[in-house]
Amino acid sequence: RGCIELGEDCDGSKDDCQCCRDNGFCSCYTFPYKWGCIC
């Protein structure tokens, strides 16, 4: 799975983390109509 940037969309699955550009890990958070990524 490719790295994603802070704020990019993710699939909304809390346990499906992706790496960030700085080699940190992302977690998903939920907006009313979309999911986002925080690292």
Swiss-Prot record:
Pfam families on file: Toxin_34
Alphabetical UniProt keywords: Calcium channel impairing toxin, Disulfide bond, Ion channel impairing toxin, Neurotoxin, Secreted, Toxin, Voltage-gated calcium channel impairing toxin
UniProt PTM: Disulfide bonds are present.
Subcellular location: Secreted
Coiled-coil stretches: none
GO CC, any one term: extracellular region
GO MF term set: calcium channel regulator activity; toxin activity
Tissue-by-tissue expression: Expressed by the venom gland.
Regions that span the bilayer: none
Alphabetized InterPro entries for the sequence: Omega-agatoxin_II/III_CS, Toxin_34
Family to which the UniProt record says this protein belongs: Belongs to the neurotoxin 04 (omega-agtx) family. 03 (type II/III omega-agtx) subfamily.
Function text: Omega-agatoxins are antagonists of voltage-gated calcium channels (Cav).
The name this protein goes by in its record: U2-ctenitoxin-Co1a
Native source organism of the sequence: Ctenus ornatus (Brazilian spider)
